[in-house]
Amino acid sequence: MNPALHLGVALDGYGWHRQAWRATLAAQPATESVFSGRYWSGLAATAERGLLDFLTIDDTLTPQPGRRESISPRRLAGRGDAVLVAARIAPVTKHIGLIPVATVTHTEPFHISKAIATLDHVSHGRAGWQPRVSSTPHEAALFGRRDAFADGGELFDEAADAVEVVRRLWDSWEDDAIIRDAQTARYIDRAKLHYIDFHGKYFSVKGPSITPRPPQGQPVVAALAHAPRIYEFAATSADLVFITPIDDVSLDSILDQVKVAGGQHLKVYADLVVTFGGDTEFGSDALIFDGTPADVVDLLLGWQQRGVDGVRLRPAVNATDLPVIVDELVPLLQRAKRFRTSYRDGETLRQRLGLPVAPNRYTEVRP
């Protein structure tokens, strides 16, 4: 029997086309603002109706996608905080995984740790995190604390340290540290909170966290990777990697590079921008595919045969392309018995992705 395909969706603004805002307003003049909780809740409800593994929420330190300092008046400008958006939609969803982007370059790992741990608690074990680096001088100037790194490799060295700190902080409370025993007047077992005592080139963090250990123990860490150094970062720091093949040849090459980097344990999702009859003349780091839902299914299953675990679809225009994914593409996969027909109640995101239980590195072995 052929294995089921894993499928997620990547959300950014009104969609991944640079003029998605215009297409959205043309199709739905009364559509909500991207700063509205109702807008994001609606997208999440649609994605969950399609039984998708997870949704990711993009974020950067610039008001528009890309590395330019100047702001184009013709493109959507401004963005909310992805982690806060995920926390907003967690209570109105029940099953779908929530993976926001959070930039590590100018953000303390302590803050990221407690934010993602909180998201995992409020979503009952459905949280993940996609670290991102920031490399431009104008992004560094927003914070006024230091210059941008000249060496991109150093950015990922720092990012690896940041992820390690975050992971240690998630483990700094044992699972049963909270007692809540009114009779003995003990709320917490202090012996089950641990200093992490991390000392590295970029961070020195004592810990423990101020947030109890997340329900998953270790929320899922994902990385978007385009190059060998980032495949190495994913292999050492992540559970899940998003790759960007443009054809079968590049897919085979990337999968080989991920393995060479030590990423045999990673769940590999290929990114694909999809538009169903829309414009394809726009820039993207990932392949842009225009076709019918059946055409997309053929491509996805072909990629699965070549070795990916799943695909993360990026709708060119959320308002028009996401419903086609959910209402037309997913049923085709279901009829082919290649996609789930229901969620499992109480399933965490780690469980859905087939990741192992995350042991606590600080828990002593007790008789």
Spell out what each predicted region is.
Residues 199-202, 209-263:
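Long hydrophobic segments that form regular secondary structure
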Residues 1-92, 216-219, 365-367:
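N-terminal beta1-alpha1-beta2 module of alpha/beta enzyme domains
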Residues 1-31, 95, 137-143, 192-224, ...:
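N-terminal small/glycine-rich loop or linker at the start of catalytic domains
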Residues 141-147, 151, 162-168, 251-259, ...:
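C-terminal helical cap(s) of enzyme catalytic domains, especially alpha/beta-barrels
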Residues 7, 47, 51, 89, ...:
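Conserved, mostly hydrophobic/aromatic
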Residues 32-47, 112, 223-236, 288-304:
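Short, acidic/polar
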Residues 5-11, 55-57, 96-102, 125-131, ...:
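Hydrophobic faces of well-ordered beta-strands that scaffold small-molecule active sites
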Residues 10-35, 105-195, 240, 249-250, ...:
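Flexible, glycine-rich active-site loops centered on histidine and acidic residues
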